[in-house]
């Protein structure tokens, strides 16, 4: 590949964040002075990245049935664009897996399936299941969007996540017969290392370290976000302790 551009954005509209409320709504002031309400595709607290008055970009929709005509895509934090649309990481990773972008996974799979049931009574779904020739162990890949940064270190989670804890326990249950991977999608280009967010969810941090000791593979993937698109930058250093 000659370019590390992995996901081009459609034409985006600049604005300024004026308010985020009820989790799903964001008031954005456009260059004209008009204030519009955009869909906020991130239900989390967005710790450290939701600062009123910050520059943002939104995408327009041509779907007349949509209640909100715009989607909030990114926000600028300390001169770095941070992707906040949680629907994007899985799209990017699916493309990357299908096109063998990750050197760490080369020749380890031939097929990619999304949202595959697994876990106790098949009541959970893993983001991606990678398989190859019969007799080879499948690879389970769970993706976590990561936006919080402290001193060039990306942290996940940014709040208590019982769902994230559940995913770690389910991936650990697959060991040692299969090879699970936790892929952290670092949705900003200013982080060079990754660590569990113990300050925000110490239980998650404990579980992650336990899972790694048992064989869980961690891929903290760095991405640069720009209004033109998302670029893959390679892996961040995984820090088990800060």
Swiss-Prot record:
The gene is sfsA. This is Sugar fermentation stimulation protein homolog. Pfam families: SfsA, SfsA_N. The lineage of its organism: Bacteria, Bacillati, Cyanobacteriota, Cyanophyceae, Oscillatoriophycideae. It comes from the Bacteria. CDD domains: SfsA-like_bacterial (cd22359). GO terms for molecular function: DNA binding. Belongs to the SfsA family. PANTHER family: SUGAR FERMENTATION STIMULATION PROTEIN A.
